[in-house]
Amino acid sequence: MAAALVALRRRLGFGNTSLAFLLGGAVAIASGDLAVTASHPWAELLRLLRGLVSPDVMAVDGRALLNTVAFAVLGVGLGAAAGFALALVFPRFLAVRALCAFLRSIHELFWALLLMQVLGLGPLTGVLAIALPYAGIFAKVFSEMIEEADLSTLRVLPTGTGTLPAFLYARLPDLLEQFGHYTLYRLECGLRSTLVLGFIGLPTIGFELDAYFKQGEFSQAAALLFCFYGLVATRRLWARSWTAPILLVASLLVLPAGLPTEHVLRNLARFATHDVVPAPLRGADLLSAAPWTALARWLGDILVHQVLPGALNTLILSQIALIGMAMLSLVLFPMICRRFARRFGRPVGRALLVVVRSTPDYMLAYVLLQTLGPSMLPAVIALVAHNGAVVGYLMGRQADALPYRPDAPRGLDLYCYETLPRLYGQFLAYVLYRWEIILRESAIFGILGVTTLGFYVDGAISELRLDTAVVLIVATAALSMTVDAFSRWLRAALRIESLPVRLSTDAAGGLATAPVPVGLS
């Protein structure tokens, strides 16, 4: 096996890797359900467009806006604090790295669905659903920032200075600015996550959007959506280092009260001692062979009838979306490049990409599902649009940083023979990195009816088979971590593992693509 991997690594190249993914995408397209099943899709799309151009601002619920910000601030803040604590021991302990990988491999929606069984639809459910995966993300990113920080200040410390004082006084002051900028950038991601949590009942903008979309009130939905874009667009104005304490305190005051403590403790006891215990083991004599034989049959049934078909459809959907995202990003990135877009075209292109990447793909798929009908097609379009805009934006920034000769060609020749060949390694780094993110998102689209792993998770929770739901969620996490590990192996084999792969924030608070520790976005 090891020899085969070494041989494969030697044969890998940009061309062979691209061809393999294209062939995989072709097989996935042939296998996927991409039909338009709605009776009158164009009529529904026209109604949606009419609503977008005539927003009803009187329908905006200010409380939902405040809740959206509050959930995001508290969830990201708690995740950053926990991630910082984990980052201090992240490089030393394999168990910590495995825990962080597990936390971030489970989507916020899955965390929320589980937490609801204990905490109900209270504020703590939304905050923890964001904080848990973000803690894993922050731990990894903060750990890499710590490892790559300047160590010169340590050399002037007195001999015998302890590890903790040395870190607090010599290293932390230099890292605080990086930590702060990354945390504030993550707040934008938290806002998108909070909106999506509203679709399963939490009192955010997403809850209002869900109601308006179901009723066909697209003008009201458009007004709320534009307010959300306003929150994201102005994030750098109201979310700064000096406003963070104010936002945290205000968020605590804004959120409604949750379940009484005694109810939470009772729910937690039931959840841990009954709900998630596999059905064959409940009340059984664990010293006899019968319950363990029944457990094996129970797990085998879940594996054959739910995990395998769900995982296959998740991989099919993610592979189609990955190829579509790659192609779309190659088309989009010239829209924001000085060498390709004209003076007035760049601002329009930049605004378009920012709006599309700020739109949660789950919400976009939800809307398209109502207009195109149930199939993989709405999910594919949503994943391709959102991730294609992200990668296109990053590629455009990289293209602007390239030095060109004075006699460089123009137009299509410049794109095909100079810009794209020089950026292709960076392009593959972005695509391979987004692979795991797309797969994680593909799994949760099952909640909308696409038969990915999330479809079976949602069904199990709806039927109160929480033991089955936990098995399916663990399987989803295992699939996500496997794809992530393979993606990292491919990037190392192609010698592109050191290239930047995420949106980050520079010292001025703007988006940057300079080489920074690899994070998750």
Residue ranges of model-derived segments:
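Cytoplasmic-entry segments and transmembrane alpha-helices of multi-pass inner-membrane transporters
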Residues: 85-114, 331-367, 393, 397, ...
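Hydrophobic positions within alpha-helical transmembrane segments of bacterial inner-membrane proteins
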Residues: 72, 76-88, 109, 178, ...
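Transmembrane alpha-helices and adjacent helix-loop boundaries
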Residues: 38, 47-51, 92, 105-112, ...
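Short hydrophobic, aromatic-rich alpha-helical segments embedded in or entering the lipid bilayer
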Residues: 40-48, 201-213, 263, 270-272, ...
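N-terminal, non-cleaved signal-anchor transmembrane helix
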Residues: 1-73, 77, 81-85, 89-92, ...
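Generic hydrophobic transmembrane alpha-helix motif, especially the helices
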Residues: 103-134, 353-384
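Membrane-cytosol interface at the C-terminal ends of specific transmembrane alpha-helices
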Residues: 123-186, 190-193, 374-438, 485-488
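Hydrophobic alpha-helical transmembrane segments of polytopic membrane proteins
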Residues: 205-240, 453-489
